[in-house]
From Swiss-Prot:
Binds 1 potassium ion per subunit. HAMAP family: GTPase_MnmE. The gene is mnmE. It comes from Mycoplasmopsis agalactiae (strain NCTC 10123 / CIP 59.7 / PG2) (Mycoplasma agalactiae). Its EC number is 3.6.-.-. This is tRNA modification GTPase MnmE. One of its GO terms (cellular component) is cytosol.
Length: 445
């Protein structure tokens, strides 16, 4: 039960600005504010004017403010809440916060208002995470993805999957408790068909979510190739800054260099890697091993070639590993100014001449057809991991049925699938999950 009153600066407090907002929420929020506010206590969803005074030092006036009253449960937090709109000076804002703390409120933890909103049933974790995603969005596509989650349709889609599973679990429980009960045998083709239908929906969600996750967390692009083909030069030219060291000495890049880049509403995360070659130098070899590891982590593999160098076994290894892992593979020939002819197998660029438009447009084209209006996807790695776990549990259940296992074995996997789906929208009893998630929210949110 939530039984204390919390406060934090929701807007402002770090730089001087026009207006700051201080939020107070909890069972004693009205009484705490009344101690330092000279105006009237308004009815719910009204605004009243008055002074904030220092009641501990002769009622000295601190500021003229507007108080917004949100009483009862019909508000964001789901409990009595007051928002004080004061002048936005850093000193004034923090002075009012200190008065609220001195008069009985506790400083809120990061994300605690949103956590209370979740615990009070005002929103689920999908919307809570969407709010945090919107606050931290750095591209137009990220903003659209976050706002899309506000309408609750994704939550309803997850709930529908849970309801379908719950019905089947209920049927199986009856067959376990009352084996003599005459109804559809849970090991019939009909049950398998229904489970496969749910699994196929989840498979589609995973497919859609891979792309939405890339858009929100950044599309990971690993730049690979032999030494001195221009990997670092291409990265620097795209970023328009000297992020990576460029020399004529083979093996200059020995560790991973990462950089974020925004282009046409998308966020890209470039990973420049060590040139891949046969070497006995221990440190360089470690860097080369890391380069191959990045193929597994990447969404896109940029394979850079130099027309003045012949292809070798390392080029084949890069290409084959990217294809074996079903990565988006983009072969790029740098130093196009050295060529007289081209073919359609490669993209042709010149880092030296800053001629990189074909590469930029290729990267955008891969993701331009993403359907941001689809409700059947989840946004982040936490949600995606859970939907994948639910998918695996369903696969295990279907396999167990086909192998003729007893219902009490099959039902374990079905309950696990249901539990994973439930964790996507959130359960109030999962304290570790809530702690981990809300700690990343802003203070005052």
């Amino acid at each position: 039960m939530i039984n204390d009153t919390i406060t934090a600066i929701s807007s402002g407090g770090k730089i001087n600005q026009a207006i700051s907002i201080i939020r107070v929420s909890g069972p004693d929020s009205v009484n705490v504010v009344k101690k330092i506010f000279t105006g009237k206590v308004g009815t719910s969803h009204t605004i009243t004017f008055g002074n904030i005074v220092d009641n501990l030092n002769g009622n000295e006036v601190i500021d003229e403010v507007l108080c917004m009253w949100f009483l009862g449960t019909n508000n964001f937090v789901g409990e009595d809440t007051v928002e004080i709109n004061c002048h936005g000076g850093v000193v004034i804002t923090n002075s009012i916060l200190e008065l609220l703390l001195a008069n009985g409120a506790r400083l809120a933890e990061p994300g605690e208002f949103s956590r209370r909103s979740f615990l009070n049933g005002k929103m689920d974790l999908i919307k809570a995470e969407a709010i945090n995603d919107l606050i931290h969005a750095s591209t137009v596509s990220q903003t659209k993805l976050a706002i899309k989650k506000f309408d609750g349709k994704t939550s309803m889609y997850i709930q529908d999957l849970k309801d379908e599973l719950a019905y089947l679990i209920g049927e199986m429980e009856v067959s376990i408790d009352y084996p003599e009960y005459d109804f559809d045998n849970p090991f019939t083709d009909k049950l398998i068909s229904r489970l496969e239908s749910i699994r196929n929906k989840i498979s589609k969600t995973i497919e859609l979510s891979q792309t939405s996750r890339m858009i929100f967390e950044g599309i990971k692009i690993a730049i690979l190739g032999k030494p001195n083909v221009g990997k670092s030069s291409i990265l620097n030219a795209i970023l328009e800054e000297d992020k990576a060291i460029v020399t004529d000495i083979a093996g200059t890049t020995r560790d991973i260099v990462e950089a974020m880049w925004q282009y046409k509403g998308l966020l890209f995360k470039f990973i420049d890697t060590a040139g891949i070659r046969d070497t006995k130098e221990k440190i360089e070899k470690i860097g080369i091993d890391k380069s191959f590891e990045q193929i597994e982590k990447a969404d896109v593999v940029l394979h850079i070639y130099d027309p003045s160098q012949n292809d070798n076994e390392f080029d084949s290894q890069i290409k084959n590993k990217a294809h074996s892992l079903n990565k988006i593979y983009v072969p790029v020939i740098n130093k196009k100014d050295l060529l007289e002819t081209t073919n359609d197998e490669f993209l042709y660029v010149s880092a030296k001449l800053n001629d990189l438009d074909p590469l930029k447009e290729k990267l955008v084209s891969v993701f331009k057809n993403v359907d941001l209006n689809n409700d059947q996807y989840v946004n982040n790695s936490r949600q995606l991991a859970l939907i994948k776990q639910a998918h695996k549990s369903l696969e295990d259940a279907i396999k167990s049925i086909k192998l003729g296992y007893d219902p009490d074995v099959v039902i374990i996997d079905l309950r696990q699938a249901w539990s994973h789906l439930t964790d996507i929208t959130g359960r109030a009893d999962n304290e570790l999950l809530l702690d981990e998630m809300f700690k990343n929210f802003c203070l005052g949110k």
